[in-house]
A protein has these predicted regions:
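Periplasmic c-type cytochrome electron-transfer domains
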Residues: 2-70, 74, 92-94, 113-116, ...
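N-terminal start-of-chain detector that recognizes signal peptides
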Residues: 53-55, 76-78, 104-106
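Short, solvent-exposed coil/turn linker segments
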Residues: 60, 65, 85-87, 103-106, ...
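Periplasmic/extracellular electron-transfer cofactor-ligation site
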Residues: 67, 73-100, 125-134, 155-160
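Extracytoplasmic electron-transfer domains, predominantly the class I c-type cytochrome c fold
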Residues: 96-153, 186
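Short, flexible loop/turn segments with low-complexity composition
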Residues: 159-170
Length: 186
């Protein structure tokens, strides 16, 4: 009986040791193009769902006005390019991110079934290991709610909000030359 218990303890101790050895060996998938290891997506998704369920605030979507949706569209256009725009090609780092950011203005990408508080939580906190940043230090609380309401109503936006989203992209400002550029040229 001692041999059984000793073998069981040794076997259980070997699992984390072998897992750590696998990760440290350099063979574990770490590049964006690598296939995920078994259970990776399940565990990450389950952790995210549980956290959101516990922390997402409750708010009634009916309380948002068309003006809120237009304001949300302006913020979305500036900050949410990875998730696409209506009738527009995707902007942002799609080919180099894992998982690929969902396109929120395509019928299969709508998050209109998500409560607005869930979208707000994602905007505020970001999503670990996905490339989705936290906007809590960039946007005001009101702006985060406006964006959350916008994506919650993505399939039935007022014309004014759609007009904002369909405007041509604003080109990025040209970079200024370094302060010491003239010294470098001499």
């Amino acid at each position: 009986m001692k041999t059984f218990w000793g073998g069981l303890i040794l076997g259980l101790a070997a699992v984390p040791v072998l897992g750590i050895a696998y990760v440290l060996s350099g063979y574990a998938p770490a590049a964006v193009a690598d296939r995920p290891v078994p259970l990776e997506q399940f565990l990450a998704g389950a952790a995210l769902a549980a956290r959101i369920h516990r922390e997402a605030p409750q708010r009634d979507l009916a309380g948002f006005t068309d003006a809120d949706l237009v304001a949300g569209a302006n913020v979305y256009r500036r900050s949410c390019g990875c998730h696409g725009l209506p009738d527009s090609p995707r902007r942002g780092p799609r080919p180099v991110t894992f998982p690929t950011p969902p396109q929120l203005f395509t019928p299969d990408g709508y998050v209109t079934d998500d409560p607005v508080g869930v979208s707000y939580w994602k905007v505020k906190n970001g999503i670990r290991l996905t490339g989705m940043p936290s906007f809590k230090s960039v946007l005001s609380d009101e702006q985060m709610w406006q964006v959350a309401a916008l994506v919650a109503k993505a399939d039935k936006l007022p014309k004014e909000a759609l007009d904002v989203l369909k405007q041509p992209p604003v080109p990025a400002p040209a970079a200024a030359p370094p302060a010491n550029a003239t010294k470098l040229q001499k």
